[in-house]
UniProtKB/Swiss-Prot annotation:
GO terms for biological process: protein export from nucleus; protein import into nucleus. Detected in brain, placenta, ovary, testis and trachea (at protein level). Widely expressed. Highly expressed in testis and in proliferating cells. GO terms for molecular function: nuclear export signal receptor activity; small GTPase binding. This is Exportin-2. Pfam families: CAS_CSE1 (PF03378), Cse1 (PF08506), IBN_N (PF03810). The modification N-acetylmethionine is found at M1. Changing C842F: In a colorectal cancer sample; somatic mutation. Found in a complex with CSE1L/XPO2, Ran and KPNA2. Binds with high affinity to importin-alpha only in the presence of RanGTP. The complex is dissociated by the combined action of RanBP1 and RanGAP1. Interacts with CFTR. Belongs to the XPO2/CSE1 family. InterPro entries: ARM-like, ARM-type_fold, Importin-beta_N, XPO2_C, XPO2_central. Transmembrane segments: none annotated. GO terms for cellular component: cytoplasm; cytosol; extracellular exosome; membrane; nuclear envelope; nucleoplasm; nucleus.
Length: 971
């Protein structure tokens, strides 16, 4: 694409069309842009439009399109073509900073994001002058430009907050500090002075405070990994100014908005974060500044209102106190009883109150409420911060704090008892306070793992939680119901089993509550209880204990999916899945109804899949239905096929990308349930599974391979006789997979199934070509993962076709190649093979090479016989060699999978690990001893002589042990 006016005009027209609400106009325009984005100059045309277009809407559209283009294409992925040519990359980096800084703020943000995406890949090595260009702009004095630089620097450097320590990271941070720390400090001082100069100019202050917020965020990022020498030397400058800003109050910066935090609140919030970082990580250096910050932040807390706009500030201020109070250095600041009482009364209790805004979220924005309350995304809420402060104080002052709070809890419960319908919020705060007080350590998976022994959790449960849940009206006091259910979830490991068992029917009733939060919590609590483990690692609750409630449990769970707002509620679907898993055959009588409901739900959500977790659990539930029913009655598989195939066909025909991998996995499960040959309905699908377009989506690959393996296991004879013309297509899939470092193991899974199951004559003509492809890949790109898979394959081939066939195919490709493979690959690398089945395949294969391959005994290969035996004994006895060459540490590959598909999206569609050797060999060591005995019978004297002269002493000792265990000797 040339950088011409005509192309700019065309691009403008198509960008305009992408904004059209009519899909008939919008979609073709989007498709056109996708089709041309691979052309040279395409990104430069977008940047030129940004600069030259007079239409602001087109400029914004071009900036968003450019950012998304960079996001999709900038990263260079191994095994894939470079999507942006080098000339375009150079031109983009040369122009983008200047363009970003000279653009209006709306466009500046998009380009700033694009720079940070490029920077993540290219900075510093491939973009060394980026920092210099940015720092030079500080001199401009134009705060529009300066804020653009700061925003970009923030998006570039914020990853330092969560990167793992490494030499590479230190080197980069040092480079950034050398170039950036001094100019940033000077800018900080200059901006503070300008704030004084312009103290009465509201518009100037807004720009300057935006800068101070970004500068404070950069301070946090640059100080996160370690305390840089520069910032230690300049701590006085930073901390004095932070303290001044923390105590500053300028009426011009106050806002009327009760919801949205203003610039002053955002700046103070960030300063609280910065102070907490120093108090936690650099307490020695920060010690002399700390008392001033504690006082300032305390004053801030007792003077700040309850409005939502102050939430972030208050929660960060409380988090600062929480991080300080649990450090031994600062214990003395809190140990006075009056101080503790004051903190409880003035900070903790007021910030645990259930406010009108919380009530509004509970009723009208339940999804967000649940996300915050249940999933721990409440990191910035007042309640969460107050809870953390309680935990922090309990670290050193558990007794006094528990005593103070017990008084508050009792008085709150008394207030509630006086008039429950008016004072229910008092009980809500009491429950929250007890939860905060009792929880010392908590995980998502297990609830509370460590509790405050001074709080009687069971007594509180019986007296104050159970009565609310036993109330006949499930819709009364919904917040308290949700609190009670959450209490069960959190303290499920502390409350005795008999009380939990009493709760189960109550939770089942609450699945019918109108409140989305209440019925969601009820489903989640049931799901968590059903996963609890007893002393012997079996589930704590047995199917027999839940049996009395089976019908009402299943009915209420499926009814809950029909309640307003919960048609795709992931917690309910997860509870359905977990109930199936726990109850097993107890659900069989209900399956016909349940599978109909699941199928209808699947059809409905396939029109517009928008809830990935819900969809996942739905497919898991379908798999469980199939597994449980067909285990009891394999013939029932036909009923499932009748119920599901119509929907599956629609999903495949409409190319519902999110569901296709799931459909293939369920079909694999169904096909594997057939014990004999493949039904014709599956065979009709077989040719379609080989279409290249399906294999282009990496998400499909594991599921497709699994399905093809099922075809090969169940119907290899049918394929060989009725679909022999499809074998080249099958091998074409193998060839594509083997060429990719990310998917080569999937190629081996497919190849192993072909070798194991297909009639030998149907693949004879392709065998040599298969080996040539594997050797080409070995030559071009040898990785540890590939070698492990290759070793399993050649040994499986040896078991299937015989040792001599393996030697002949190697030497048929190139003379003496068999010896090279033994010497360069099998002997040195066999130790790397992992997994019991994989090791067994290799052991049996190598045993065959040692004892059933005549050239190993009487040609130039004989010298490799003992080293091969030694390597096999090493495979049995030495620890696995899990070293990876240095150059492979940074290859982005999955953990090395085993012989069967390690990746299985659906846990309940997973298949048992398949052992192709099976009962043929139970104990590979005994098998080796027996095979050596047989060989020594055929050529007396030779085997003992080779073993005694060349095998090292330790290996010889192990071998004698195998011979003894097998009750055989070498002749």
């Amino acid at each position: 694409m040339e950088l011409s006016d005509a192309n700019l005009q065309t691009l403008t027209e198509y960008l305009k069309k992408t904004l059209d609400p009519d899909p008939a106009i919008r979609r073709p325009a989007e498709k056109f842009l996708e089709s041309v984005e691979g052309n040279q100059n395409y990104p430069l045309l977008l940047l030129t439009l940004l600069e030259k277009s007079q239409d602001n809407v087109i400029k914004v559209c071009a900036s968003v399109t450019f950012k998304n283009y960079i996001k999709r294409n900038w990263r260079i992925v191994e095994d894939e073509p470079n999507k942006i040519c080098e000339a375009d990359r150079v031109a983009i980096k040369a122009n983008i900073v200047h363009l970003m800084l000279s653009s209006p703020e709306q466009i500046q943000k998009q380009l700033s994001d694009a720079i940070s995406i490029i920077g993540r890949e290219d900075f510093p090595q491939k973009w060394p002058d980026l920092l210099t260009e940015m720092v030079n702009r500080f001199q401009s004095g134009d705060f529009h430009v300066i804020n653009g630089v700061l925003r970009t620097a923030h998006s570039l450097f914020k990853r330092y907050r969560h990167e793992f320590k490494s030499n590479e990271l230190w080197t980069e941070i040092k480079l950034v500090l050398d170039a950036f720390a001094l100019p940033l400090t000077n800018l900080f001082k200059a901006t503070i002075e300008l704030c004084s100069t312009h103290a009465n100019d509201a518009s100037a202050l807004r720009i300057l405070f935006s800068s101070l917020i970004l500068i404070s965020k950069l301070f946090y990022s640059l100080n996160f990994q370690d305390l840089p020498e520069f910032f230690e030397d300049n701590m006085e400058t930073w901390m004095n100014n932070f303290h001044t800003l923390l105590t500053l109050d300028n009426k011009l910066l106050q806002t009327d908005d009760e919801e949205e935090a203003g610039l002053l609140e955002l700046l103070k919030s960030q300063i609280c974060d910065n102070a907490a970082l120093y108090a936690q990580k650099y307490d020695e250096e920060f010690q002399r500044y700390l008392p001033r910050f504690v006082t300032a932040i305390w004053n801030l807390l007792v003077t700040t209102g309850q409005e939502v706009k102050y939430d972030l500030l208050v929660s960060n201020a409380i988090q600062f106190l929480a991080s300080v109070c649990e450090r031994p250095h600062y214990k003395n600041l809190f140990e006075d009883q009056n101080t503790l009482t004051s903190i409880c009364e003035k900070v903790i209790v007021p910030n645990m109150e259930f406010r009108a805004a919380d009530e509004e979220a509970f009723e009208d924005n339940s999804e967000e409420y649940i996300r915050r309350d249940l999933e721990g995304s409440d990191i910035d809420t007042r309640r969460r911060a107050a809870c953390d402060l309680v935990r922090g104080l309990c670290k050193f002052f558990e007794g006094p704090v528990t005593g103070i709070f017990s008084g508050y809890v009792n008085s709150m419960l008394q207030e509630y008892a006086k008039n429950p319908s008016v004072n229910w919020k008092h009980k809500d705060a009491a429950i929250y306070l007890v939860t905060s007080l009792a929880s010392k350590a908590q995980t998502q998976k297990h609830g509370i793992t460590q509790a405050n022994e001074l709080v009687n959790l069971t007594e509180f449960f019986v007296n104050h939680i159970l009565p609310d849940l036993k109330s006949a009206n499930v819709n009364e006091f919904p917040v308290l119901k949700a609190d009670g259910i959450k209490y069960i979830m959190i303290f499920r490991n502390q409350v005795p089993k008999e009380h939990l068992l009493v709760s189960i029917p109550l939770l089942i009733n609450h699945l019918q509550a109108e409140s989305i939060v209440v019925h969601t919590y009820a489903a989640h609590a049931l799901e968590r209880l059903f996963t609890m483990r007893g002393p012997n690692n079996a589930t704590l609750f047995t199917a027999a204990e839940i049996a009395p409630f089976v019908e009402i449990l299943l009915t209420n769970l499926f009814k809950a999916l029909t309640l307003p707002g919960s048609s795709e509620n992931e917690y309910i679907m997860k509870a359905i899945m977990r109930s199936f898993s726990l109850l097993q055959e107890a659900i069989i009588p209900y399956i016909p109804t349940l599978i109909t409901q699941l199928t209808q739900k699947l059809l409905a959500v396939s029109k517009n899949p928008s809830k990935p977790h819900f969809n996942h659990y739905m497919f898991e539930a379908i798999c469980l239905s199939i597994r449980i029913t067909c285990k009891a009655n394999p013939a029932a598989v036909v009923n499932f096929e009748e119920a599901l195939f119509l929907v599956f066909t629609e999903i495949l025909q409409n190319d519902v990308q999110e569901f296709i991998p799931y459909v293939f996995q369920v079909m694999s499960l169904l096909l594997e349930t057939h014990k004999n040959d493949i039904p014709s309905s599956y065979m009709a699908l077989f040719p379609h599974l080989l279409q290249p377009v399906l294999w282009e989506r990496t998400g499909n690959i594991p599921a497709l391979v699994r399905l093809l393996q099922a075809f090969l296991e169940r119907g290899s004879n049918t394929i060989a006789s009725a679909a022999a013309d499809k074998i080249p297509g099958l091998l074409g899939v193998f060839q594509k997979l083997i060429a990719s470092k990310a998917n080569d193991h999937q190629g081996f899974y497919l190849l192993n199934s072909i070798i194991e199951h297909m009639p030998p004559e149907s693949v004879d003509q392709y065998r040599k070509q298969i080996f040539i492809l594997l050797f080409q890949r070995l030559q071009n790109s040898k990785t540890t993962k590939f070698i492990k898979s290759f070793l399993v394959f050649i040994n499986l081939y040896c078991i299937k076709y015989g040792a001599l066939a393996l030697q002949e195919i190697f030497d048929g490709i190139q003379p003496k190649m068999f010896g090279m493979v033994l010497e360069k690959i099998i002997i040195p690398e066999i130790q790397k093979v992992s997994g019991n089945v994989e090791k067994k395949i290799c052991a049996v294969g190598i045993t065959k090479l040692l004892t059933e391959c005549p050239p190993m005994m009487d040609t130039e290969y004989t010298k490799l016989w003992t080293p091969l035996l030694q390597s096999l004994i090493g495979l049995f006895e030495l620890p696995e060699d899990d070293t990876i060459p240095d150059e492979e540490h940074f290859i982005d590959i999955e953990d090395t999978p085993g012989y069967q598909t390690a990746f299985s999206q659906l846990a309940f569609a997973g298949k048992k690990e398949h052992d192709p050797v099976g009962q043929m060999v139970n104990n590979p060591k005994i098998h080796l001893a027996q095979s050596l005995h047989k060989l020594s019978t055929a050529c007396p004297g030779r085997v003992p002589s080779m073993v005694s002269t060349s095998l090292n002493a330790e290996a010889l000792q192990y071998l004698q042990g195998y011979l003894q265990a097998a009750s055989v000797t070498l002749l």
